[in-house]
Amino acid sequence: MGRREEMIAKIKELMTQPERIRNMGIAAHIDHGKTTLSDNLLAGAGMISEELAGKQLVLDFDEQEQARGITINAANVSMVHTYEGKEYLINLIDTPGHVDFGGDVTRAMRAIDGAIIVVDAVEGVMPQTETVLRQALREYVKPVLFINKVDRLIKELKLGPNEILNRFAKIITDVNRLIKRYAPEEFKNQWLVKVEDGSVAFGSAYYNWALSVPYMKRTGVTFKDIVELTNAGDLKTLRQKAPLHVVVLDMVVRHLPNPLEAQKYRIPHLWRGDINSDVGQAMINCDPKGKMVMVVTKIILDKHAGEVATGRVWSGTVKTGQEVYLINSKRKARIQQVGIYMGPERVNMEAVQAGNIVAVTGLRDAMAGETVSVEQIEPFEALHYTSEPVVTVAIEAKNVKDLPKLIEALRQLAKEDPTLHVKIDEETGQHLLSGMGELHLEVKLYRLKTEWKLDVDVSPPIVVYRESVTKQSPIVEGKSPNKHNRFYITVEPLPDAIYEAIREGEIPEGRPKDPKAVAKKLAELGLDYEIAKGIVDVYNGNIFLDNTKGIQYLNEVMDLLVDGFHQAMDEGPLAKEPVMKVMVRLHDAKIHEDNVHRGPAQIYPAIRTAIHCAMMKAGPVLYEPYQKVIINIPYEYMGSVSREINQRRGQLIDMRQEGEVMIIISEAPVAEMFGFAGALRGATSGKALWSTEHAGFKRVPNELAVNIIRQIRQRKGLDPNPPKEQDVCPQQ
């Protein structure tokens, strides 16, 4: 039996013992060494050869990832580790640290129960560290900490043991501050990471060594030994004395929960159904004999097998030939192949039971986030993404005969990555692709060329703006075209606290399942409870409230009013850009008794025009997306980089020096950031390391707004002059 077969046999045996399984991920800020850590863990567990690890970046198996040196797709690998004489199955999901791929991180978090948070010892906790940790804690994923690149503190910064320990203490304090802030109430203290119990390890993923207090106690290796061996350059002895995979995987087995433990507290939070039902109990108990339920976390296209859906099995057993329901898409499907991952390689199995990560084919048209079950059940909570698409490009096929293929390719990309928004316009042949940033879109366009062999024309990137209001409007009347229906509404700015709660997922988007609970939450955040009681719908960071009393036939048209509200929010009055942070209130209505006279053709224009007219009376403004830009540069380039940021309407937020390196944190409008990579390379002779993350929206300065509105309107084929109130409000 070869090594590979032996490994598969072991994995098969352990898959049926949930107490021996750990589903875990590794998450970090970009370039903090996440993929190098993953690869050396795999090498240690015998999945790839040690010579290749760290150079090969085995999890970066997309050729583009290898070229860019950043992880783009969350890949999954199963491996075996022995701890205190027992074998454990560890399913490792590698996630990207680059903000443009934040959606992948969110989806991976749904599948795992624990995460190693990697922090660079030199840079410390960075903005993206906070983002990934917040995502983990929101999904009830327990963290442990690995402090990486300790060799740089010894060799480059020449710190002594005490200074190094002070550095560790600061990082641990920073991480614990975030855990206290973002962890679920019941785990705020329980999940804090501590050096003493081994929930913190430190080392160098690149040089393949690590230490933790339990390991030091067990083996007698001291930190002093490490400093001496590093300074002497004796890396071989270092690796033998303190092997990375042993220390880190021991920490994983000891501190991260198995599926039996984790599902007890994760299922009530992640699933909206009745916990006391048979299927609810089967998931809470991770029961392989229960009804099969899995959640798809990723879709990839395999040249031979077609669409492969990776996901977490919460209850029951996934088997070949099983007939299943795709709950969100309201469709049936039949599972064709069932398997697990070992790196990019998929190994087929007859069945995979609850508590494992599975790869299946046959779920055509499933999207990431889909709930799959053998019977119709409540779906899992919608996955919550931290960023929103802010950059758009228009794409056209150069060759008309490629049009059907392009549409198919765009649909496929959207299915694999729900953070990518695709708008297909079959009439004009011009399709819009919106993503989290320039890099996100570049990667997708590259795939159109290489995987789909498509030749496309791409417009320069366009920024997605938002429209909003600055004050409360008077009551505005909206009349239906036949004059038989009238709606009286106001709009006003949505308070910041409520907008943030919607963005954070504390107030769910959509029609509330439990309006009383949502009204209570709105009241806690400062809205008058009498007004909040009228909550009807939450849509893209806007809310619609019904504050009428006893209006006849209102319930019959409420669905149409909500649709009309969506239309008004999708395209605001200034430049047909999406609307954000607006509260729309319905105060009164007169509705025709005969439903022939109150159909969509009457209700939509009435409510849409009323909302837009009210917005024009409420001080309409334009918001633009901002990015936080984190740049590491040698000290001498400080001046040229500051100039580069200032020229782009950017602001410096923070600066700190670490040895020879300056870390600059700034914010700048996305519109000014195109081509920044090249300019920065030029300004620093290629010596800058940088990353970005979404920093929300800010109001466009008045002196720029008129021009921007003109440009957007012109691009959309509208009259370029910004509309005035009388252009939008119907003359009475």
Curated annotation (Swiss-Prot):
Q: Which SMART domains match?
A: EFG_C (SM00838), EFG_IV (SM00889)
Q: What's this protein's family per the entry?
A: Belongs to the TRAFAC class translation factor GTPase superfamily. Classic translation factor GTPase family. EF-G/EF-2 subfamily.
Which Pfam family, giving just one, matches this sequence? EFG_IV
A GO molecular function term, named singly, is: GTPase activity
Q: Which GO terms describe its cellular component?
A: cytosol; ribonucleoprotein complex
Q: Which residues form the tr-type G domain?
A: 19-260
Cytoplasm among keywords: yes
Which InterPro entries does the UniProt record give?
Answer: EFG_II, EFG_III/V, EFG_V-like, EFTu-like_2, G_TR_CS, P-loop_NTPase, Ribosomal_Su5_D2-typ_SF, Ribsml_uS5_D2-typ_fold_subgr
Binding of GTP occurs at: 28-35, 94-98, 148-151
Per the entry, what this protein does is: Catalyzes the GTP-dependent ribosomal translocation step during translation elongation. During this step, the ribosome changes from the pre-translocational (PRE) to the post-translocational (POST) state as the newly formed A-site-bound peptidyl-tRNA and P-site-bound deacylated tRNA move to the P and E sites, respectively. Catalyzes the coordinated movement of the two tRNA molecules, the mRNA and conformational changes in the ribosome.
Q: Which residues carry this modification: Diphthamide?
A: 597
CDD domains reported for this sequence = aeEF2_snRNP_like_IV, EF2, EF2_II, EF2_snRNP_III, Elongation_Factor_C
Tell me where it resides. Answer: Cytoplasm
Q: Which SUPFAM superfamilies has this protein been placed in?
A: EF-G C-terminal domain-like, P-loop containing nucleoside triphosphate hydrolases, Ribosomal protein S5 domain 2-like, Translation proteins
Q: What is this protein called?
A: Elongation factor 2
Which segments of the protein form a coiled coil according to its record? none
Give the organism the record lists. Thermococcus onnurineus (strain NA1)
The encoding gene: fusA
- Alphabetical list of Gene3D superfamilies matching this protein: 3.30.230.10, 3.30.70.240, Elongation Factor G (Translational Gtpase), domain 3, P-loop containing nucleotide triphosphate hydrolases, Translation factors
